[in-house]
Amino acid sequence: MNHPTLTIDPGAVAANWQALAARHTGEVAGVVKADAYGLGAALIAPALAAAGCRSFFVATLDEALSLRALLPAARIGVLNGCPPGEEGTMRARELRPVLGSLAACARWRGAAGDDKAPPSFLHLDTGMNRLGLDRDEAAHLIAHPTLLDGLGLTHVMTHLVAAEEPDASANAAQRERFAAFAARFPWLRTSLANSSGLFLGPGFGSDLARPGYALYGGNPTPTAANPMRPAIALAAPILQIRAIASGETVGYNGTWRAARPSRIATIGVGYADGLPRSLSNRLTARWQGKIIPVAGRLSMDLTTFDVTDHPDIAPGDVIELIGPGHDIDAFAAEAGTIGYEILTSLGPRYRRVVKSV
């Protein structure tokens, strides 16, 4: 390996989708927003389709248009809805907006004119307080159900606040509120579970699940072993190793000081490549399965490690940042963030290697 390399395994993503589909009684979609969580929708979406996935979700209209070019027959939902004035574009490309307000419903209905409205989703906010019908709008629809006529609605959906915390009271509260609303519109199918929601038990089953993070190898059950296959590995070769004396410092502002004569290895990856600067003096990487700690602050293009305890390590040897010995969730925990952020931040300077199926 001569360059920092991000290895992507579309076969693992497909296998993860199949595993989730096997445990769910309803349909399982694939969430491929943010360029398939940074791994490349052009690579991941066809792999999911080949595995049997027929419904997909993205966040924006532009993402949906790109996905439509890849998958002409797929059912594509747009989570952020239809931008005002773009109803014609979405209708022409058979894209399905997630309607999250009465105003959005009115625009979508109005754009249909005398034609039959293309399919769409209705989004009920049950506690996230971002997008979706609020309590007053939901009550208004219950009182005036004909407002849903002409929208082409297929599903009502909501988004769980804390599905990765099985004991969180919000889970049951959201499920109950969602069920009460959905019961008023029994002709609509339901969509409730995200990745972690699929592991909350039968009470969280629905007609359509929407996993994202778990597809890419993230752990949907943080309090238990990860049931998913890893989909990425991140590694970089050592550029240089330097010997320093006891008392010398490494990196900007000298935040790491050698307590003994030490050897410092430098790799050509930094925060410009998506490694959070919060990993400074916290990251642990792997060399031939052995733990090596970061030394000092991460730079824009470089990261340094203390390899004093490994006299055989040499320039050109490969440092594993994310891989079997240190998965995406462990890496994210050291950074004080979540794996979602890490995945979607990995930059364009890596050599991207696609693992063959």
Swiss-Prot record:
Highest taxon of source: Bacteria
Catalytic residues identified in the record: 33 (proton acceptor), 252 (proton acceptor)
Cofactor(s) the record lists: pyridoxal 5'-phosphate
KW Isomerase (keyword) present: yes
Any one Gene Ontology cellular component term annotated for this protein: cytosol
Catalytic activity: L-alanine = D-alanine
Residues that bear N6-(pyridoxal phosphate)lysine: 33
The name this protein goes by in its record: Alanine racemase
Organism: Acidiphilium cryptum (strain JF-5)
Lineage: Bacteria, Pseudomonadati, Pseudomonadota, Alphaproteobacteria, Acetobacterales
This protein's encoding gene: alr
